[in-house]
């Protein structure tokens, strides 16, 4: 899925929402695509999560939008991908049975915390108040 939102952070959230939706609505497809190696061979390091062309462009947009370095934006993206993949994997394998809404709220809270960790002031985080409920 290619994100369509103007805001880089919101576009990234669109991808996370779609990822979790696949895990919940079609767990066998999720397992086939993301857990059984369909999308390529295992990587030697975590940097592989953020080095594809789409993510590199998103990192540049997030960096510019939030006035943080590309390195900080990269760490934010990487941490959020790992967290989202973990939640989606727990859902697809039946370990948790939360609603998509609950899972996205959890992902959004973690993503906001990752932004703060990378030096983004709370007032610059889109929808901070909503995700902290």
What are these regions (language model features)?
Residues 1-28, 70, 80:
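Hydrophobic alpha-helical connector segments
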Residues 2-9, 41, 96-100:
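Short, surface-exposed loop/turn segments at secondary-structure junctions
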Residues 20-24, 59-63, 85-92, 115:
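Short amphipathic alpha-helical interface segments enriched in basic and hydrophobic/aromatic residues
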